Design a protein with these regions (language model features):
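Loop/turn elements at helix/coil->beta-strand transitions in domains of secreted/extracellular proteins
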Residues: 24-29, 54-58, 85-87, 111-114
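Solvent-exposed, polar/charged alpha-helical surfaces in well-ordered, non-transmembrane soluble domains
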Residues: 12-24, 42-49, 86, 101, ...
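C-terminal, low-ordered peptide segments at domain boundaries
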Residues: 1-27, 49, 70-73, 77-78, ...
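Solvent-exposed, acidic/flexible segments
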Residues: 3-14, 33, 37-44, 81, ...
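Conserved P-loop NTPase
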Residues: 127-130, 137-170
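Active-site-proximal beta-strand/loop segments in catalytic clefts of secreted hydrolases
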Residues: 2-6, 32-36, 61-64, 91-95, ...
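Terminal peptide-recognition signature
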Residues: 1, 31, 51, 88, ...
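Gly/Ser/Thr-rich loop/hinge elements
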Residues: 39-98, 124-131, 145
Length: 173
């Protein structure tokens, strides 16, 4: 299943795709996050919930405001659409960023996916965007960490199996 971005509707579309594939007898999943720049964190976490049992850590955030200097731990809520024994592979590249890295970290650190591809982008921050003087201003509001506590900002996630993909390859190849 290819996820091009995480929008407000991605989670529902993904759930429908998963349910359809399971009804057709799917025994494993490949989730393609190559060049997915991110988007809705809620959508990313919702998809992680489909694979990770109740109560497991999905990510931890540390907000930058002085009044809220506590870590916030996001845990799975128990909607397990895919059995824990079903193999999952995630495809990633240097263009895999932000919400895509949240999903990648959550599935890998909870032993739910094998990550294949090249080093991800390394956007370990959450930002709020506001319109400002005819343009936009991004304000960093939080830093996030994978379930294992890894800080991926400006580092990325190293795949379990590194496959260097030359930029000249298209999606069709």
């Amino acid at each position: 299943i290819r996820i091009l971005e995480f929008s407000q509707t991605t989670q529902d579309s993904f759930r429908s795709d998963v349910e359809e594939l399971l009804s057709q007898g799917a025994e494993s999943f490949i989730i393609d996050l190559r060049n997915n720049r991110g988007g809705s964190v809620d959508s990313s976490l919702g998809i992680a919930n489909m694979f990770i049992p109740d109560g497991k850590t999905l990510m931890t955030t540390k907000f930058k405001e002085k009044s809220n200097n506590k870590d916030t731990v996001y845990t799975s809520t128990g909607y397990l659409a895919v059995d824990e024994n079903v193999p999952v592979v995630l495809l990633v590249t240097g263009g895999t960023a932000s919400a895509s890295e949240i999903l990648t970290g959550a599935l890998r650190d909870n032993d739910r996916a094998l990550v294949v591809g090249s080093q991800t982008f390394g956007k370990g921050i959450m930002q709020f965007t506001i319109a400002f003087m005819g343009g936009y201003l991004n304000i960093t509001v939080a830093h996030y960490y994978t379930p294992s506590g890894a800080d991926i900002h400006e580092i990325g996630i190293t795949p379990d199996i590194v496959v260097n993909v030359d930029e000249e390859y298209s999606d069709e190849e």
